[in-house]
Amino acid sequence: RGQTRGLGYDAYRFLAETLGPAAESTFVSAADLVQEYLDTRLPDEMPHYTAAVAVTEAIVTRALSNDVITPGTTTVGDVRRALYDMLGAAGVRTWFQPDLRVQRAAGEVATSRGFLAVAPESTVLMPGDVVHIDFGISYMGFDTDWQKMAYIMKPGERDAPAGLKAAMRNANALQDALMLRQGRPGRTGGTVFTGTMAEMKTQGIEAMIY
């Protein structure tokens, strides 16, 4: 599907300014063609796409469950191998390497390019850890992309700590600002980003969108 990746607004302006008005006047938008190509679906395809979503959800849910994770014993590498085993059992493949990231209370959080870094394969998952999985499958030309988080409860706990629940509410507030209020037709990506970040600032929430 590489042929469907078009120009962003900034790239368009760069080409127009670099090549000049004469060349810009010959530019023809392929947006309608690309959109029609991507939007065209046969009725018989839809059950398969629904199945792809269900398979992705089932694999990730099991990978984050006690079926796979034994706190104090299971490593990041073990979970990754379990993901690949479940892919094989389901007869599907992934379109990128599944990543796991781990946040640990009172522990130094490694970052990469400003984001939480992928955890080493040897990292042992412990009670109190927050585990993040980035995972997706490819099936009949359709790619899923799941990002899920789980909290490994400590002995005696029956629910996630209040602080983690507050963090989830903040994340939901960011989602609402981005998808319900700022992300409207006719706006550039930069405008949506700036508006969303400004809204988060007024709510006292430190946020980032990528």
Where in the sequence are the language-model features?
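Active-site neighborhoods and metal-handling regions in enzymes and metal-associated proteins
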Residues: 1-210
